[in-house]
Amino acid sequence: MSKDLDKEDILYKKRHSIAHVMAEAVLDLFPNTKIAIGPPIKDGFYYDFEFKKQITEDSLLDIENRMREILKTGSSFEKEIISVEQALEIFKDEPYKIDLIKNFDLQNEVSIYKSHNFVDLCRGPHVENMNKIDPKAFKLTSIAGAYWRGSEKNPMLTRIYGTLWNNEKELRSYLNLREEIKKRDHRKLGKELDLFSIHEEIGPGLVFFHPNGAKIRALIEDFWREEHSKNGYDILFTPHIGKSWLWQTSGHLDFYKDSMFEKIEMDKSDYYLKPMNCPFHIAIYNTGKHSYRDLPFRWAELGTVYRYEKIGALHGMMRARGFTQDDAHIICTHSQVLDEIKEVLRFAIYMWSKFGFSNPKAYLSTKPDKSVGNDSDWEMSLKVLEETLSDFEVPYEIDKGGGAFYGPKIDLKIVDSLEREWQMSTIQFDFNLPERFNMTYTAEDGKEKRPFMIHRALLGSIERFFGILVEHYGGAFPLWLSPVQVVIIPVNNIVEDYAIKVFNKFKNEGIRIKLDNSSSRMNAKIREYQAKKIPYMFIIGEREATEERISIRTRTNEQINGMKLDEALKFILFKIRDKEI
C-alpha cells in the first residue's frame, strides 16, 4: 500500500501539513525546543528537533493529543513570500533555520507557511486548512536520532516519525502491516530460527551463517551456479584483496575511496580489500589476446566484497560491510549487445520466479551531464535497454540524467509479500573500465577494437537477498529451501523400527529429514516444529506402521491422513524438484 507520492497528491499535502502541526504541538509541550526540518516521506512524515531534555516514546501520546486539539481549530495553511532579511529576523532564535537561510541567495525571496500559532520556512505544498485532515487517520510511530544535514560532524537531533492516511481504515491497515513487518524482521527470525548472527565485538556489519542459514545459502548458491552454467556462463574465483595500482587505474581510489576499507601496508606495497569484482574480471580478460570469434564472454562470480558503511547505516543482512555479490560481466561486440541484454533480463525474471517473485518494475537511468563514452554508444545502449524492457513487457520509469557517468543502466525491482519494493537486479553498461584498462579484441577487419562491457547482478548481495527471503516468507521457506524439510514423529516406541525405515528411505533420496524419538509429548513436538517452520511432520502410529503409511501434518496445521509411503516420497520429491513455492 506504500508508494512514493507526487507533490500534488492530496496525501502528500496532508502529510506535509501534519508535520507542521506536530512541530507546533512539540513547541507547545516542550518550550525552548529548536526546530529543524519536517518533510513528508513514503508512508508518513517526520520532524527533527533539538530538545533541551531528551524525550522518550512515552511522550508521543501527549504530542498526538495536542496535535488533535490543534487540528480541531480548522486553521488555514497560508503561504507568504518574504525577503531573506525578513526570514533571518523571524527565525533569529532558530539556529537550524538560520543555517538553511544562509545558504539562500540574499537577493532572493523565500516562502514561509503560517498555520494556527506556528510559522515555518517552507516551499509547500499544503492542504488549504486543517479540516482536510482526519484526526483519527494519523499516528506517531517512533523516535530516532538523526544528524543535522546527515553529517556526523553536526549535532545529533531527535527525529519523530509519524504516519498519516486518508482515513482511519487506511491507517489501521497500514499499522497492521507494520506489525507484520516487525514480526518478520529478519534479525528477529534469524535468532529464533538459528540462521545467522552478527557479533559487534568481532566486527559490525559482518555476517556469521549458522548451520541452518548456511544450508539455505548453499542451496541458493548451488542453484545459482547450476543455472549460470546452463545459461552459458563460466564461473570465476578471484582474490579478496588487490594492490593500490589496480584501484587507482579503475578509478575507485578517486571516486569510491570513502566506501573502501583503509589500506593494508604489506611487503612495501599498499593493498585494499575489494569493494567490487569488476577489475579482477578485467585482469583475467587482459591475460591474453582475443578475437571477435571468442566473444561474448559471460563471466560470473559469487565474489565477496567489503565496503565501509557507516555504523548508523548498517541493518542486519540488508546493509552489511562484508557481503557476497552475484556479479557477472558480459564482454561482447557491438552486434551482440541486444541479444545479450535480452538474455540477461529473461534470465533475471526466471531466477526471481524460482524464489517466488514476479512482475518486476524497472527504472531506466539515462545519460548525466558529465559522462564518458561517445554519444553513439550511449544512444545505442539506451535504445537496447528500452527495446528489451518493451519486449518483455516490463513497466518502467525513466530517470532522466540519473545514469552513472560511465553508462546507462536498468535497476529492476520486485515487490515482496509485505508490499515493499526491493531493488533486485542491475544491468549496467560500462564505457569507462574498458578504456581505463585498455581492453581490446581483434575485429573481423583485423583492427583492434574496444569491447562492450555489461555489468549485471541478478540477486544482488547474497546476504541481502537472504534477508529479503526471510521476511518475504516469514521464515517459512519453500520446501526446497528449508534446512530441515521433514520431521518424523513416532507416537510410541512400538513403531520405532518403522519410523527408522521411513527415515532411511527419505534420507537416501537426499531429503533433509529428522527423526524425533524423544520422550516429549507428541503435541508438544508438533508445536515445536511448527514454531521452527518445518514444512512437514510425519506422524507415525501403529496403524501407519502396520499398513506402511504415514499421516502428514503441515506447519500450517493441514493434515493428510494415511498416505502410502511410496506416494508420500513421490509427493515430497516432486515439490522439491519442481522448486514449488
Curated annotation (Swiss-Prot):
GO cellular component terms, semicolon-separated: cytoplasm
Cited SMART domains: tRNA_SAD
Compartments, record wording: Cytoplasm
Region of interest: Catalytic: 185-478
The keyword Aminoacyl-tRNA synthetase is assigned to this record: yes
Keyword Protein biosynthesis part of the UniProt annotation: yes
InterPro entries with a match to the protein in the record: aa-tRNA-synt_IIb, aa-tRNA-synth_II, aa-tRNA-synth_II/BPL/LPL, Anticodon-bd, Anticodon-bd_dom_sf, Thr-tRNA-ligase_IIa, Thr/Ala-tRNA-synth_IIc_edit, ThrRS_anticodon
Cofactor (UniProt): Zn(2+)
Catalytic activity: tRNA(Thr) + L-threonine + ATP = L-threonyl-tRNA(Thr) + AMP + diphosphate + H(+)
Main location: cytoplasm
Highest taxon listed in the record's lineage: Bacteria
Residues noted as binding Zn(2+) in the record, renumbered to the chain: C278, H329, H455
Short name of any one Pfam family annotated for the protein: tRNA-synt_2b
Annotated EC: 6.1.1.3
Cofactor binding note from Swiss-Prot or TrEMBL: Binds 1 zinc ion per subunit.
Transmembrane segments: none
Keywords linked to the UniProt accession: Aminoacyl-tRNA synthetase, ATP-binding, Cytoplasm, Ligase, Metal-binding, Nucleotide-binding, Protein biosynthesis, RNA-binding, tRNA-binding, Zinc
An example Gene Ontology molecular-function term: metal ion binding
One GO BP: threonyl-tRNA aminoacylation
Subunit structure: Homodimer.
Cited function: Catalyzes the attachment of threonine to tRNA(Thr) in a two-step reaction: L-threonine is first activated by ATP to form Thr-AMP and then transferred to the acceptor end of tRNA(Thr). Also edits incorrectly charged L-seryl-tRNA(Thr).
The protein's name in its UniProt record: Threonine--tRNA ligase
Source organism of this protein record: Borreliella burgdorferi (strain ATCC 35210 / DSM 4680 / CIP 102532 / B31)
